[in-house]
Amino acid sequence: MLQLASLSDRMAVERLARQVHALHCQWRPDLYEMPELLYPEERFVDEIRSRSLYIAKLGDTVIGYVLLKIRDSQGIGLVNRRVMVLQEICVEESLRNQGFGKEMVADIHALARAFRCTDLQLGVYPQNDEAVSFYQKCGFTIRSIEMQKKV
């Protein structure tokens, strides 16, 4: 289902990214605000060049996208790992709970294997119950809890 994004997909990705970012702004107004563009042309081109941005289509319509990064973890006291980080994922709001997200995650898993990654990793806000449940159904487990204190 996933394919590399092309320049012509920019506005569709922007529209989808705004759906997700609106939730981030709602949950963490101390961190997020809605910019004029989440994917200005330069950023979009950079993500395409780095082969990090993928889209999902239904017919000719972009219905989802993912932004992936690969991180090699190594250092003193660390097991060498190659982790594919799922930085952003979105399925069009009106098409959620129809299996498209699961299909996208299956494709991400296949990409991770192709890139010889040892793990898939993502972050999700705990108040996003729907997403937490979805990721758990896809086989993800909670590995850490991030904490913060206002100064």
Predicted regions and their residues:
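Conserved beta-strand-loop-alpha-helix junction that forms the acyl-donor binding cleft
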Residues: 107, 118-131, 148-151
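A short beta-loop-alpha structural element at the N-terminal edge
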Residues: 1-16
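A short helix-loop-beta-strand connector motif used in the catalytic cores of GNAT acetyltransferases and
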Residues: 42-55, 85
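Conserved acetyl-CoA binding element of GNAT-fold acetyltransferases
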Residues: 79-93, 123, 148
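Conserved active-site alpha-helix within GNAT-family acetyltransferase domains
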Residues: 102, 114, 126-144
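Conserved beta-strand in the GNAT
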Residues: 55, 61-70, 85, 90
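Conserved GNAT-fold acetyl-CoA-binding loop/helix
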Residues: 21-43
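Conserved acetyl-CoA pyrophosphate-binding loop and the N-cap/start of the following alpha-helix
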Residues: 95, 99-107
